[in-house]
A protein has these predicted regions:
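A contiguous, low-structure linker/loop signature
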Residues: 48-75, 79, 217
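Hydrophobic/basic alpha-helical segments enriched in Actinobacteria
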Residues: 29, 34-39, 67, 74, ...
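Conserved catalytic core of Hanks-type protein kinase domains
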Residues: 6, 143, 177
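Conserved P-loop NTPase-based nucleic-acid remodeling module centered on helicase motor cores
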Residues: 1-58, 172, 216
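Proline-centered turn/helix-capping motifs that create local helix->coil transitions or kinks
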Residues: 50-59, 93, 148, 204-216
């Protein structure tokens, strides 16, 4: 609330617990069989788009350029995106992505606010870094500024939220962006049996597009 008051006039709008109540009526208004598209798929696509700072006017061209297949045709989704934003504004609500976008805009447009925010936090630690999306990464970098006081923890083989825009590339490319960083490998496994880890290691060795060298080590007896 403090940060919002420094960036916007008026009180902080209420956050949406879920996009479903706003998306349900919009889903049912889609033509033909598209009205049966799962609301969750529509919500995931909204989060994917917002993670790339797309808006209804830029969405369709972006997905076509990327060769992405949305849950409904791009023109239909762009219209749904626009109606969702209007419904959200009428309800006086914001979603989680709106909060991140507003914070990032504050860093980008208000030097005084950026310096104030940066001064309140010196060290940053990010868990599950493999599930970071472009919007979150941009906000993290803006909050850091010129500092390098950052620790991240993640596993590129446990990336889950790619459907909403996350990518493990920020984790796997961390040492390139921060060449002075110290890498600590957490390979001792205290949960699984050696048999399970042997199978996991065989599968991981075949994972395409991932840096190798990881080998999980069992600490439990067979």
């Amino acid at each position: 609330r403090y940060f919002w008051s420094r960036l916007s006039e008026g009180r902080l709008p209420e956050g949406l617990d879920s996009k479903a109540p706003l998306l349900g009526p919009l889903q049912r208004s889609l033509p033909g069989g598209y009205k049966f598209t799962a609301v969750k798929d529509l919500a995931d696509e909204l989060e994917w788009a917002k993670a790339r700072r797309l808006d209804p006017s830029s969405y369709q061209a972006a997905v076509e350029a990327m060769g992405r297949t949305p849950p409904v045709p791009g023109d239909l989704f762009a219209g749904l995106f626009r109606r969702y934003e209007r419904a959200k504004d009428r309800a006086g609500k914001i979603d989680f992505e709106d909060m991140l976008v507003r914070m990032l805009e504050g860093f980008e447009t208000r030097d005084d606010v950026a310096e104030e925010f940066r001064g309140q936090y010196r060290w940053f630690s990010v868990d599950e870094y493999q599930d970071t999306n472009p919007l979150q990464q941009a906000l993290l970098e803006a909050w850091l500024g010129e500092r390098r006081d950052l620790a991240v923890v993640g596993d590129e083989d446990q990336t889950i939220y790619t459907f909403t825009g996350a990518t493990s590339e920020y984790l796997t490319g961390f040492s390139r962006r921060f060449p002075e960083a110290r890498l600590v490998r957490l390979e001792d496994n205290y949960r699984s049996t050696p048999q399970v880890l042997a199978m996991a290691n065989r599968l991981l060795a075949r994972t395409p597009g991932q840096p190798r060298g990881k080998r999980l080590v069992a600490t439990r007896p067979p």
